[in-house]
């Protein structure tokens, strides 16, 4: 394993190379808008935003030398952030994580850029539709939802 100093030097070198190659990351505000649309259940807007395939998006940081692995990592990041935004919007913790886990496991089986992009579209629309339906029901507040999560997680233990 590399020392902390060697890791820092390597990181500085990679930052230098990125600047030299004019590699830039995508702006933050469109990313916030994207996840907010999922949280709000805005299906039409998510379909618009996902119209450009994940594998064609500009400004994605380089996460792997292996192209498919690179996109799988970005997919996993999207799944994790979508889950968190959905939890903020009232989806139960167990449901949000379960969906995220499911799609991350599915992306492992993808064999092409197109497979990953197609699954990305399906996942984003799935989360968004679920949030739209959840907002329709809106039967309880977030604190009550947290209590329900706790009870569900503790069904096989004594609650006192």
Q: What residue ranges belong to the model's regions?
A:
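Gram-positive cell-envelope targeting signals
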Residues: 1-7, 147-150, 154
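Hydrophobic, helix-rich cores of sensory/ligand-binding and other regulatory modules
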Residues: 1-130
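Alpha-helix N-cap/N′ positions at the starts of helices
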Residues: 26-29, 142, 146
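Alpha-helix N-cap and coil->helix boundary residues
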Residues: 94-98, 139-143, 159
């Amino acid at each position: 394993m590399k020392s902390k100093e060697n890791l820092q030097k390597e990181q500085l070198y990679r930052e230098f190379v990125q600047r030299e190659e004019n590699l830039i990351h995508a702006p933050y505000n469109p990313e916030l808008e994207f996840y907010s649309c999922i949280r709000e259940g805005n299906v039409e807007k998510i379909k618009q935003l996902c119209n450009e395939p994940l594998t064609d998006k500009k400004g994605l940081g380089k996460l792997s030398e292996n192209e498919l692995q690179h996109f799988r990592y970005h997919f996993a990041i999207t799944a994790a952030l979508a889950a968190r935004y959905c939890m903020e919007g009232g989806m139960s913790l167990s449901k949000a994580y379960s969906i995220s886990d499911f799609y991350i496991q599915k992306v492992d089986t993808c064999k092409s850029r197109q497979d990953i992009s197609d699954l990305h579209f399906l996942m984003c629309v799935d989360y968004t539709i679920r949030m739209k339906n959840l907002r329709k029901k809106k039967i309880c507040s977030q604190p009550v939802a947290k209590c329900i999560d706790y009870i569900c997680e503790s069904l096989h233990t004594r609650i006192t």
